[in-house]
């Protein structure tokens, strides 16, 4: 069990596929720290059992009869706020529905990529356990709020003094790198939505997503923000007011080419040392090198410690760093690693980060 976990994590599984119910249940019940307290075959039964059983976490399919997963999620969040992990298909339509679910309050998602392939089944099992345990770290750390992640406007926590006052950092960089994981899709929209379209610097983003999701996600952000936002392609040049999102399933590196900074996309085989894909560490490290430290690094909510090494390298080259605070992080892992590792110049609640990026870059 986790350090602060005093009992088993109680999970409700909601899925209309008997095969998926069996797979999810068998994976979770093999872990002694997890208890599957209920099974529901559609969204309506899922809402009923959520109210009756009050689980710590719900795994929720999206496409179901009687009541779909997003409608069920909205009812759960209205009646008994619970952490919900969406189980979605690896398609463009599945991606769009997943982002709707995240907007409605789901904390994360897992692609439904269970085929006859032994490798695919292994990846699904590992990803499911990793995300459920990541949710557990927040469940046993603090209570669930009644609002979706987008609406988290918690008062700033008392944070350690920043090593460098933010007023002294303005105008010290020409590029921005942002990394995130769990809770990141909604958090990133909040951050980018507060940066004006005429922002004078280029922005690169690495967020842990599968291949089929980053394109629709970039399109979604582009429709909601003033900045121009697109999925990055190999050879793209970083330009002012443009946000390049690392393509899912690959790593993004930055390299200097003459007077420009260009994108290089790499396969997982070319960067086997990274667990998370796309790697925030690799993006931040190469951004620091390509810009000789003339960059602002930002770490948002997410599990694990991806981004810490990259932020540390950026700081060693004179770069600037901002990290999301604990109170507004869906999962505090990535921010915690940076803060406790001493690589955060400034620690801010989510709703202040975008404005600070805009102010410093103005």
UniProtKB/Swiss-Prot annotation:
GO terms for cellular component: cytoplasm. It comes from the Bacteria. HAMAP family: CheB_chemtxs. Coiled coil: none annotated. Involved in chemotaxis. Part of a chemotaxis signal transduction system that modulates chemotaxis in response to various stimuli. Catalyzes the demethylation of specific methylglutamate residues introduced into the chemoreceptors (methyl-accepting chemotaxis proteins or MCP) by CheR. Also mediates the irreversible deamidation of specific glutamine residues to glutamic acid. This is Protein-glutamate methylesterase/protein-glutamine glutaminase 1. Its EC number is 3.1.1.61, 3.5.1.44. It catalyses: [protein]-L-glutamate 5-O-methyl ester + H2O = L-glutamyl-[protein] + methanol + H(+); L-glutaminyl-[protein] + H2O = L-glutamyl-[protein] + NH4(+). It holds the Pfam family Response_reg. Contains a C-terminal catalytic domain, and an N-terminal region which modulates catalytic activity. InterPro entries: CheB-like, CheB_C, CheY-like_superfamily, Sig_transdc_resp-reg_Me-estase, Sig_transdc_resp-reg_receiver. Keywords: Chemotaxis, Cytoplasm, Hydrolase, Phosphoprotein. The lineage of its organism: Bacteria, Pseudomonadati, Thermodesulfobacteriota, Desulfuromonadia, Geobacterales. CDD domains: CheB_Rec, REC_CheB-like. GO terms for molecular function: phosphorelay response regulator activity; protein-glutamate methylesterase activity; protein-glutamine glutaminase activity. Residues 163-357 form the CheB-type methylesterase domain. Phosphorylated by CheA. Phosphorylation of the N-terminal regulatory domain activates the methylesterase activity.
